[in-house]
Amino acid sequence: MHPQVASLFDNVYEDLAAATLEFIGTAFFLLFGLGGIQASTAEDTASGQPPASGIEHVLYISTCMGLSLVVSAWLFFRVTGGLFNPNISFALLLVGGLKPLRFVLFCIAQLTGAIAGAAIVRGLTSAPLSVNNVLQQGTSAAQGVFIEMFITAALVLSVLMLAAEKHEATPFAPVGIGLTLFACHLFAVYYTGAAMNSARAFGPAVISGFPEPQHWVYWVGPFLGSLLGAGFYATLKHYKYWHLNPDQATSDYRKSPSDPVALLKSTAETFINVGDEETRNGCASNEEGVRATGDEKSSNATSSRTNFSPV
């Protein structure tokens, strides 16, 4: 076997173990995220009350998915990275954060974990699954693709900048990533269901028999979003983005801004000193001008006497 090919399998047992835990983490994430959405729908149906308003429903779904990702990603962050998303895995592969074998194993684990999570939600609740990603009436397939592309790119960029990039805030990356998911849901959940994760759309679709005829939107859009997010990150790295705002991630208090009062006082003193210096320079220039004029007159008088000759 070629050495480069053999190197792909150097850590195969660790990759298999990580993929197994990624399967568990994905099922865990979607169990609580989708379970909360399913519970909301079941409560509206069982209570006989009018369904919650659109804004309440959007907020509830966004909160369920965002908090579920914060908790799940934080639990598995030190173990597998807490990806739970083949589109995130693909972006990490593109930027060198995942090796090819682990990428393939993670994608399999995430897709099967999504099926398992959706199956558990369906088995534990009495109502049919109401958590499938579907395009809202009036939303075209092209609009759905671009919405999914942009929100996936935002999620990818949050993972790359907060987790893949190492800095002092990296241990808290799951919070920022979860908030990004929450914000993206606020925008897109009405139009597309806000998948930004092909596994999240695939799992419930398998259990429900693929009720959305345009399910392909949730593969094409997130795939393009992975490319967009990874490309933007690569551009930032290539042009050394950290030079634009050096010491931003440091905790050294000496890098903090100086005392504003002292800075204001120093600036005022500088302006006063500059004004005094300009005044002194102006006076000196006037004195030199007066002396130069007097010397010129004396020189002219002397020249006149020297050049005078009687008739």
From Swiss-Prot:
It comes from Laccaria bicolor (strain S238N-H82 / ATCC MYA-4686) (Bicoloured deceiver). Residues 288-298 have a biased composition (Basic and acidic residues). Induction: Shows similar high expression levels when grown between 15 and 33.5 degrees Celsius but a 50% reduction below 15 degrees Celsius. The chain crosses the membrane at residues 17-37, 57-77, 79-99, 101-121, 144-164, 169-189, 216-236. Residues 38-56, 100, 165-168, 237-311 are extracellular. Aquaporins contain two tandem repeats each containing three membrane-spanning domains and a pore-forming loop with the signature motif Asn-Pro-Ala (NPA). Lacbi1:392091 has NPN/NSA motifs which is in accordance with the fungal aquaporins (NPx and NxA). A motif (NPA 1) lies at residues 85-87. This is Aquaporin Lacbi1:392091. PANTHER family: AQUAPORIN TRANSPORTER (PTHR19139), MIP17260P (PTHR19139:SF199). GO terms for molecular function: water channel activity. SUPFAM superfamilies: Aquaporin-like (SSF81338).
